[in-house]
Amino acid sequence: MSTGPDVKATVGDISSDGNLNVAQEECSRKGFCSVRHGLALILQLCNFSIYTQQMNLSIAIPAMVNNTAPPSQPNASTERPSTDSQGYWNETLKEFKAMAPAYDWSPEIQGIILSSLNYGSFLAPIPSGYVAGIFGAKYVVGAGLFISSFLTLFIPLAANAGVALLIVLRIVQGIAQVMVLTGQYSIWVKWAPPLERSQLTTIAGSGSMLGSFIVLLAGGLLCQTIGWPYVFYIFGGIGCACCPLWFPLIYDDPVNHPFISAGEKRYIVCSLAQQDCSPGWSLPIRAMIKSLPLWAILVSYFCEYWLFYTIMAYTPTYISSVLQANLRDSGILSALPFVVGCICIILGGLLADFLLSRKILRLITIRKLFTAIGVLFPSVILVSLPWVRSSHSMTMTFLVLSSAISSFCESGALVNFLDIAPRYTGFLKGLLQVFAHIAGAISPTAAGFFISQDSEFGWRNVFLLSAAVNISGLVFYLIFGRADVQDWAKEQTFTHL
């Protein structure tokens, strides 16, 4: 086991004889066989589980709210002619399985329920990120994954008990999910070499899109065949099954990992030798408040997640209402933008690291360029959606393109906090999550209000507002965004309240 002096000696040796480049080449050949890439894949699985639990209510709520079928419809099959056909009994059994409680929830109530996941998340990210940064993310993330998965199993019972209990359960579940989404970035402070930071974080982050894809693809089918409660039972169970995988395989520091090779450990440690990654107990709050580069990231987070949460919550509803798709087809069509986005997130991370490692573009140029691409093009596409609603193929093409291009932000402003203040990654990620969840609490509620006022022009107003918010955040980030470590984030500088 390496000690502090040993690590420093190794750094000195490699710095003097140039072996860092050799170690880098050896580790790069391993690709996804390296421990750090294996860690990214495990985090991808965790994000997959969390986002299936976030999205399952969005895909199930059209089945939970049945405003079109008359009350007597479940008994309509009794009017059929009597037959001994096996197909008839199979169909009857299928309809019986699909029968589940339907609730009389207005669009406003649905918007509140969909937003409730974020209501309890305003204060949780900051302490979660701070604790993960100081004590390590292993147990913070693992506990959050288990709590969120366990509570998912009880959503059908909460819905039967009443809207209030369902909202409370989703609030608690949102707090647990914040522990996962916030704490995981503290791991990359000690595991991600600067030249691989974008690809490792995007591989892990792509689990969010992959989870959304799977739950949208399978959710509608599950609702139609065995009933909407099983959407929560199945994906909650998957999350619980992931927990035993997390605890024995995850370590906060590569120095302590029992399976990592000496070459990979040396490469990671030496790559981060010039970067102050030691967690800071004392927070330079006053300097953070005055930091325009930090505010640029905060504003960008709020604006980009405004659009993200709107799309995530209302894509199934838009497809089912505007395209008149049934529940199964709505789930399949809603899944397409997310699977393409999952692929593009990883490709964007690889491209960003390629441009940086080959010194084609500076880091700040990469961050701003990828953010601009990920904001401008999707905004234009979404604003154009109401004018192509008569064409189903064009509508789906626009939705897929919007999701694919917006994924470039994951290698832009959304990862920029790792560049400017690695010492305070956990705390800053928690602070950023607060802004993201504020957007997540407001945007679906606002969308539900617009849609309830006018179903046709309501969607147009939703897309116009989302585009305006997104572009305003981009302008602020382009003006004030930076990628160098800030003075207040260096060990020598401490400013206290």
Swiss-Prot record:
GO MF term (any one): thyroid hormone transmembrane transporter activity
UniProt keyword annotations, A-Z: Cell membrane, Glycoprotein, Ion transport, Membrane, Sodium, Sodium transport, Symport, Transmembrane, Transmembrane helix, Transport
InterPro entries: MFS, MFS_dom, MFS_Na/Anion_cotransporter, MFS_trans_sf
GO biological process, one term: phosphate-containing compound metabolic process
Residue positions with a glycan: N47, N56, N66, N75, N90
Family designation: Belongs to the major facilitator superfamily. Sodium/anion cotransporter family.
Catalytic activity: 3 Na(+)(out) + phosphate(out) = 3 Na(+)(in) + phosphate(in); urate(out) + n chloride(in) = urate(in) + n chloride(out); L-thyroxine(out) = L-thyroxine(in); 3,3',5-triiodo-L-thyronine(out) = 3,3',5-triiodo-L-thyronine(in)
Protein name as catalogued: Probable small intestine urate exporter
Species in which this protein is naturally found: Homo sapiens (Human)
Keyword Membrane: yes
Principal location listed in the UniProt entry: membrane
Function in brief: Acts as a membrane potential-dependent organic anion transporter, the transport requires a low concentration of chloride ions. Mediates chloride-dependent transport of urate. Mediates sodium-independent high affinity transport of thyroid hormones including L-thyroxine (T4) and 3,3',5-triiodo-L-thyronine (T3). Can actively transport inorganic phosphate into cells via Na(+) cotransport.
Subcellular location field: Apical cell membrane
Membrane topology: Multi-pass membrane protein
Tissues expressing the protein: Abundantly expressed in pancreas, liver, colon and small intestine, less in kidney. Not detected in the adrenal glands, brain, placenta, heart, testis, skeletal muscle, and lungs.
Name of a matching Pfam family: MFS_1
